[in-house]
Swiss-Prot record:
The gene is rlmH. This is Ribosomal RNA large subunit methyltransferase H. Signal peptide: none annotated. It comes from Parabacteroides distasonis (strain ATCC 8503 / DSM 20701 / CIP 104284 / JCM 5825 / NCTC 11152). It is found in: Cytoplasm. Specifically methylates the pseudouridine at position 1915 (m3Psi1915) in 23S rRNA. GO terms for cellular component: cytoplasm. It catalyses: pseudouridine(1915) in 23S rRNA + S-adenosyl-L-methionine = N(3)-methylpseudouridine(1915) in 23S rRNA + S-adenosyl-L-homocysteine + H(+). CDD domains: RlmH-like.
Length: 157
């Protein structure tokens, strides 16, 4: 199984890019991981929120491959502790045949088409974070889950 992360828009801040790359490199010791960045929609000032979600949704769905298991990072999704998330990933490693793909949506969330294509929704917190920050936090949580599953001394209860 591979893990994929689809995000909308590039990461601008160098310190986030550096930290994201650090955790992406660490993850490669445990599981194949890829992050796909969908470019920001151009001329968003001329679009309604719904139109922007639709355009982003089309690009998200286009990035999927046959057999992908789609999980949305959504404020209304199921919340996990780090230990619970590691168990969740372990189960998915045994049941998802190809790619487990997580998606961070755009500023207004997901289109109905993306919600319909998704198998699950998970939430990292009831708080709101910037899209750039959530990428780092989520990749770190995947790394943390891998260290938990391998009984390595990274996570402390």
């Amino acid at each position: 199984m591979k893990i994929g992360l689809i995000v909308i828009g590039k990461t601008d801040a160098g310190y986030f890019v550096e930290a994201i790359n650090e955790y992406k490199n660490r993850l490669t010791h445990y599981i194949p991981f890829e992050m796909e960045v969908i470019p920001d929609i151009k001329n968003v000032k001329n679009l309604s929120e719904a139109q922007q979600k639709e355009k982003e949704g089309e690009l998200i769905l286009k990035a999927l491959q046959p057999g992908d298991y789609l999980v949305l990072l959504d404020e209304k999704g199921k919340e996990f502790t780090s230990m619970q998330f590691s168990t969740y990933l372990e189960k998915k490693m045994h049941t998802v045949p190809k790619r487990l793909v997580f998606v961070v949506g755009g500023p207004y969330g997901f289109s109905e088409a993306v919600y319909k294509a998704a198998s699950e929704k998970i939430s990292l917190s009831k708080m709101t974070f910037s899209h750039q920050m959530i990428r780092l936090i989520f990749i770190e949580q995947i790394y943390r889950a891998m260290t938990i599953l391998n009984n390595e001394p990274y996570h402390h209860e």
